[in-house]
Amino acid sequence: MAKFKIKKGDDVKIITGDDKGKIGKVLSVLPKKSQVIVEGCKIAKKAIKPSEKNPKGGFINKEMPMDISNVALVEG
């Protein structure tokens, strides 16, 4: 398993994809998959099944993992 310089809480810049140029904070690092989850980037709409808390169900916007090679660490 490779060791990454990017850690939870770091500020990173998206260098490829639809969110190119955005800067966000790393919410989590998935080292086994070489992926990171960045706050406010790669948002997907997820369906929520009805439950006791939310009897109607519905949709939520959620950050999805992206490959660690698609982000660059922002210094300072």
Curated annotation (Swiss-Prot):
GO terms for cellular component: ribonucleoprotein complex; ribosome. It holds the Pfam family ribosomal_L24. The keyword Transit peptide does not apply. Gene3D superfamilies: 2.30.30.30. GO terms for molecular function: rRNA binding; structural constituent of ribosome. It comes from the Bacteria. GO terms for biological process: translation. Keywords: Ribonucleoprotein, Ribosomal protein, RNA-binding, rRNA-binding. Part of the 50S ribosomal subunit. Belongs to the universal ribosomal protein uL24 family. NCBIfam families: rplX_bact (TIGR01079). One of two assembly initiator proteins, it binds directly to the 5'-end of the 23S rRNA, where it nucleates assembly of the 50S subunit. This is Large ribosomal subunit protein uL24. It comes from Campylobacter hominis (strain ATCC BAA-381 / DSM 21671 / CCUG 45161 / LMG 19568 / NCTC 13146 / CH001A). The gene is rplX.
